[in-house]
């Protein structure tokens, strides 16, 4: 089964729980941040997963940023329109992810690791904020040859979405898709995903950037990019940062910076536009975890349908607004159709 949209990312099971500021402080964690932990390193933060499993209110939710985006795009496009690549373990966690994707209409092309468990992410919620602690597990072992085995799906795709978290796993796989996209004039969308990506994985990001025709990031990730790449502008000036990325790009590029409830900033060679976020009563906000993934899902659905940039961004904002009224990175069980 081929599909117009191919997504590459790190499939994870989210352990989601409400915690206190003191709990974050206990592990030196920050609100609205994302970090990686390694089970083999003896990192004290690995204890978080066991602690969350002991909490009766902890919810297990299918996650992984790009996988959330894939399900979001499928929510809009319908079944059979999205293929998702990533690596999982042979365990009950991956079965759960597979079932969630099937229900959402996403075709899962998992590379299965027999001896390594499926990755997991602790989503620690404080009010309307979240802090993510990720043990990549099997997600860390994706290899480009898995794409080769399913290259017919790549060739049939019309556009690609790459989760920036995958830069920590296989930049080679991203480049392989990027080269195909470039040679065949297909849109190639890259999400920065987290502030640590430009800082810690700067070389991998620099290697992949030339292939991206669209960049998506939030204000924290834009600031991190500005600092890591030493741009000569204020790290809070989203428009200036985006303009530098567009100016320095060897390909025509559109940069989209989301900023919570502040207007979305969009810069291309044609100029700068801002798109106000429609206000949502705070009493309706249930959970902001995955809001950025939902924005990307709605946006990618718009591109896949052939909508213009303005409509695609509106679809992203619309889907993000739906998602934050649900628990976890998910969407209403009853299908709601987009309308301007």
UniProtKB/Swiss-Prot annotation:
Active site location: 293
Q: What do the Gene Ontology cellular component annotations say? A: cytoplasm; cytosol; nucleus
TM ranges: none
Q: What happens when the gene is disrupted?
A: Results in a severe reduction of adenosine kinase activity.
Q: Identify one Pfam family in the record.
A: PfkB
Metabolic or biological pathway, per its Swiss-Prot or TrEMBL entry: Purine metabolism; AMP biosynthesis via salvage pathway; AMP from adenosine: step 1/1
Keywords of the record, alphabetical order, are: ATP-binding, Kinase, Nucleotide-binding, Purine salvage, Transferase
GO biological process: one example: purine nucleobase metabolic process
Asked if the keyword ATP-binding belongs to this entry, the reply reads yes
What CDD domains does this protein map onto?
adenosine_kinase
- Does this entry carry the keyword Transferase? yes
- Identify which cofactors the protein needs according to its UniProt entry: Mg(2+)
InterPro entries reported in the protein's UniProt record: Adenokinase (IPR001805), Carboh/pur_kinase_PfkB_CS (IPR002173), PfkB_dom (IPR011611), Ribokinase-like (IPR029056)
EC number from the UniProt entry: 2.7.1.20
Quote the catalytic activity from the record. Answer: adenosine + ATP = AMP + ADP + H(+)
Q: PROSITE patterns per the record?
A: PFKB_KINASES_2 (PS00584)
- Name one molecular function that GO assigns to this entry: adenosine kinase activity
Output the PANTHER family linked to this UniProt entry: ADENOSINE KINASE (PTHR45769:SF3)
Extra remark beyond the main annotation: Present with 22200 molecules/cell in log phase SD medium.
Question: Which family is this sequence assigned to?
Answer: Belongs to the carbohydrate kinase PfkB family.
Q: What does this protein do?
A: ATP dependent phosphorylation of adenosine and other related nucleoside analogs to monophosphate derivatives. ADO1 does not play a major role in adenine utilization in yeast. Its physiological role could primarily be to recycle adenosine produced by the methyl cycle.
Question: This chain belongs to which protein, by name?
Answer: Adenosine kinase
Query: What organism does this protein naturally occur in?
Result: Saccharomyces cerevisiae (strain ATCC 204508 / S288c)
């Amino acid at each position: 089964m081929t599909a117009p949209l191919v997504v590459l990312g790190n499939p994870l099971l989210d352990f989601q729980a409400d915690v206190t500021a003191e709990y974050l402080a206990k592990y030196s964690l920050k609100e609205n941040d994302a970090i990686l932990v390694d089970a083999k390193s003896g990192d004290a933060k690995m204890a978080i997963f066991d602690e969350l499993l002991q909490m009766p209110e902890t919810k297990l939710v299918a996650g992984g940023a790009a996988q959330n985006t894939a399900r979001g795009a499928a929510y809009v496009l319908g079944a059979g329109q999205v293929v998702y690549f990533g690596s999982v373990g042979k365990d009950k966690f991956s079965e759960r992810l597979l079932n969630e994707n099937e229900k959402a209409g996403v075709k899962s092309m998992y590379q299965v690791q027999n001896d390594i468990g499926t990755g997991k992410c602790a989503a620690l919620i404080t009010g309307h904020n979240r802090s993510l602690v990720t043990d990549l597990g099997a997600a860390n072992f994706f290899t480009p040859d898995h794409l080769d085995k399913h290259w017919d799906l790549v060739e049939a795709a019309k556009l690609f979405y790459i989760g920036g978290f995958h830069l920590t796993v296989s930049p080679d796989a991203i480049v392989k898709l990027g080269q195909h996209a470039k040679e065949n004039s297909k849109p190639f969308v890259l999400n920065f995903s987290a502030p640590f990506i430009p800082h810690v994985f700067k070389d991998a990001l620099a290697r992949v950037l030339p292939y991206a025709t669209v960049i998506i990031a939030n204000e924290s990730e834009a600031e991190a990019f500005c600092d890591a790449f030493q741009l000569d502008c204020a790290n809070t000036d989203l428009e200036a940062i985006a303009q530098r990325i567009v100016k320095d790009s060897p390909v025509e590029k559109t940069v989209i910076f989301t900023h919570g409830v502040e207007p979305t900033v969009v810069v291309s060679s044609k100029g700068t536009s801002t798109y106000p976020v429609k206000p949502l009563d705070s009493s309706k906000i249930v959970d902001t975890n995955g809001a950025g993934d939902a924005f990307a899902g709605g946006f990618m659905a718009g591109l896949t349908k052939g909508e213009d940039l303005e409509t695609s961004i509106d679809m992203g904002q619309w889907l993000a607004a739906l998602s934050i009224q649900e628990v976890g990175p998910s969407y209403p069980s009853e299908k709601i159709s987009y309308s301007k």
